Design a protein with these regions (language model features):
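Short, surface-exposed loop/turn motifs that are enriched in glycine and acidic residues
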Residues: 35-40, 83
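Short, small-residue alpha-helix embedded
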Residues: 40-71
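Short, well-structured alpha-helical segments that form the helix of a local strand-helix-strand
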Residues: 1-4, 61-76, 93-94
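Hydrophobic transmembrane alpha-helix bundles
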Residues: 9, 13-16, 47-58, 99-110
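Charged C-terminal helix
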Residues: 74-114
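N-terminal loops that bind phosphate or other acidic moieties
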Residues: 18-32, 57-58, 81-84, 98-100, ...
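Conserved phosphate-donor
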Residues: 1-37
C-alpha cells in the first residue's frame, strides 16, 4: 500500500501469494501453483491478461488487476490437474484461460481483501 500511495498507482507482485494494492486496499491472492514460476512465458501471459482486463475496465484498475491474476493462477491450477508434462503444461494453461467462463473464475478465485 505504501509503494502504491507514494507513486499514485496500483502495485502487483507475484509469488507464493500474489499481492495487488492501491493506497488503501490490498488483495492477497492464493491461486496458482509453485510450478508456474518454472514455465517460461507465464509472466508474459499474465502481463497481457492484466493489460486486457484494465483496458476493458479502466475505472477499476485495482479490481481488474486482481481478477487477471486470479484468472492466471486458476488457469495454472486447472492445467496442472490435466498435466502430462512440462512441455504440455504451458499449452494447458492457455487452454484453461480460453475455456474459463466468468462463473468459473468467480467460483475458483481464492483471495482476501486487506
Amino acid at each position: 500500500k505504501e509503494l502504491a500511495s507514494k507513486n499514485n498507482c496500483v502495485v502487483a507482485a507475484t509469488g507464493k501469494y500474489d499481492l495487488v494494492a492501491d493506497s488503501s486496499t490490498c488483495y492477497v491472492i492464493k491461486n496458482g501453483i509453485a510450478k508456474m514460476e518454472k514455465i517460461t512465458g507465464t509472466g508474459c501471459q499474465l502481463s497481457g491478461i492484466i493489460t486486457s482486463f484494465i483496458s476493458a475496465n479502466p475505472d477499476c484498475v485495482l479490481q481488474a488487476t486482481a481478477a487477471a491474476i486470479c484468472l492466471m493462477g486458476l488457469a495454472g491450477e486447472i492445467a496442472f490437474d490435466k498435466n502430462d508434462g512440462n512441455a504440455t503444461y504451458r499449452n494447458k494453461i492457455i487452454d484453461a484461460i480460453y475455456n474459463m467462463s466468468p462463473s468459473d473464475l468467480a467460483k475458483g478465485a481464492k483471495y482476501e481483501i486487506r
